């Protein structure tokens, strides 16, 4: 009979450990930035311009890091895909697919805001702030700095979550 009690206790203990470990995974809300976002060109402003014809960005965000893949059709009709993965530690991480910058660092400001510092050849060329609206349906990104041609830019992009 003692062996039966031990088995029941052991089984209950294992179940409790599994629930405690898996519950946070299954029941936590995902990061508001995570998901697929589509640029609303008509609501966005690009200075000096021109704006891209379209852009779709996919974010995967955890408490420690952000991964981004963004595919746009430029004003000239070319397809450009930019990608990076960066930890929220202020260090520079490589970026591929854009002529404007070659590294980025990421900083989590709050649950809905991420700041990026973009560099080209070690020099800061742009800062970007991404803010997800409280309802989680839209995201505003402001970018200031210079583009690859050295022109000052001040972009305000609006994205809608798919």
Where in this protein do the model-derived segments appear?
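N-terminal secretory signal peptides that target proteins for export/translocation
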Residues: 1-8
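Bacterial N-terminal signal peptides
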Residues: 10-22
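Hydrophobic small-molecule pocket/channel-lining residues, especially in calycin-type beta-barrels
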Residues: 26-162
């Amino acid at each position: 009979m003692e062996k039966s009690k031990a088995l029941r206790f052991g089984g209950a203990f294992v179940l409790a450990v599994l629930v405690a470990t898996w519950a946070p995974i299954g029941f936590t809300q995902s990061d508001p930035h995570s998901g697929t976002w589509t640029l609303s060109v008509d609501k966005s402003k690009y200075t000096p311009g021109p704006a891209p014809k379209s852009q779709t960005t996919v974010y995967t965000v955890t408490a420690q890091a952000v991964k981004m893949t963004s595919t746009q059709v430029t004003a000239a009709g070319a397809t450009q895909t930019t990608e990076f993965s960066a930890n929220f530690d202020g260090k520079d991480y490589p970026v591929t697919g854009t002529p404007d910058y070659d590294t980025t660092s990421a900083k989590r400001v709050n649950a809905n805001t991420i700041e990026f510092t973009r560099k080209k050849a070690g020099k800061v060329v742009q800062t970007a702030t991404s803010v997800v609206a409280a309802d989680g349906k839209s995201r505003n990104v402001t970018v200031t700095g210079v583009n690859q041609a050295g022109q000052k830019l001040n972009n305000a992009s609006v994205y809608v979550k798919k």
